[in-house]
Amino acid sequence: MMNTKKLIKMAKKWQQRAALHRKRISFQRSSSATSSTAAEKGCFVVYTTDSTRFAFPLSYLSNSVFQELLKISEEEFGLPTGGPITSPFDSVFLEYLIKLVQRRMDADTEKALLMSISSARCSSQCSLKLQERSTQQLLVF
């Protein structure tokens, strides 16, 4: 069992790394790509910032951690109209998250993970505002 403080620290580190490498994954519509990008029945597909594809069972949508992950994805990249769902996290973090969900993490670990995800979302929004301010100050001088 991991210590919750260590888990929070690890999640923050992964989120900071993911924030450095954020990008949007474009959806290719070729005949060869449609078979590989289509989700299996009963699954939904999420792409990470490092272009790794994950297929999750629909039952994961009832998990509060995945709900928070999808909210952050919506805030970061918007709702996809014809393309894939893109996660603001990298594949290492999602693999770790999958292992925690499969092992049925206890309530304390889930709460700590949700708090770290939420705090990283707030800190990334604050850093964007600081970047905007510094850009505006550069333009004034």
UniProtKB/Swiss-Prot annotation:
Pfam families hit by this protein: Auxin_inducible
GO terms for biological process, alphabetical: auxin-activated signaling pathway
Keywords: Auxin signaling pathway, Cell membrane, Developmental protein, Growth regulation, Membrane
Membrane topology annotation: Peripheral membrane protein
InterPro entries: SAUR_fam
Gene Ontology CC: one annotated term: plasma membrane
Compartmental location: Cell membrane
Main location per the UniProt record: membrane
Similarity annotation: Belongs to the ARG7 family.
Biological function: May promote auxin-stimulated organ elongation, such as hypocotyls, stamen filaments and petals.
Protein name: Auxin-responsive protein SAUR64
Source organism per UniProt: Arabidopsis thaliana (Mouse-ear cress)
Source taxonomy: Eukaryota, Viridiplantae, Streptophyta, Embryophyta, Tracheophyta
